[in-house]
């Protein structure tokens, strides 16, 4: 079993942001897959919704909304914050549309395994 040493609160906040978006836009299905290795933790979230629109490069910018009607309910900070958290943990946030419909977001965090834990 691998030892995860990334910041649990940060990972949970990113999971909350990404799952909230997936549930908001999904038609019927949201899939979550977690992969933990000695090098990284990867959280993949996929939905069967409409996918990202033409501005996929802007999705992780602050205050970005694909739907202007969301301005009243959402501040457009979730994907931005998630990207910043991933980057500050030596990782990245990958966003893509899925060929058969929907979107997939992968949050990757570097796994800081302590040397003494590796030697055990």
Predicted regions and their residues:
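Conserved polar catalytic motif of the HATPase_c/GHKL fold
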Residues: 16-17, 21
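Short conserved segment of the HATPase_c
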Residues: 52-65
């Amino acid at each position: 079993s691998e030892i995860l040493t990334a910041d649990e609160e940060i990972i949970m906040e990113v999971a909350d942001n990404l799952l909230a978006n997936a549930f908001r836009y999904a038609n019927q299905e949201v899939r979550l897959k977690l992969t933990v290795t000695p090098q990284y933790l990867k959280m993949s979230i996929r939905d069967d919704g409409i996918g990202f629109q033409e501005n996929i490069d802007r999705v992780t910018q602050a205050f970005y909304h694909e739907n202007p009607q969301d301005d009243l309910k959402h501040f457009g900070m979730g994907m931005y914050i998630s990207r910043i958290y991933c980057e500050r943990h030596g990782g990245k946030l990958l966003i893509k549309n899925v060929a058969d419909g929907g979107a997939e977001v992968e949050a990757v965090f570097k796994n800081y395994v302590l040397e003494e834990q590796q030697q055990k």
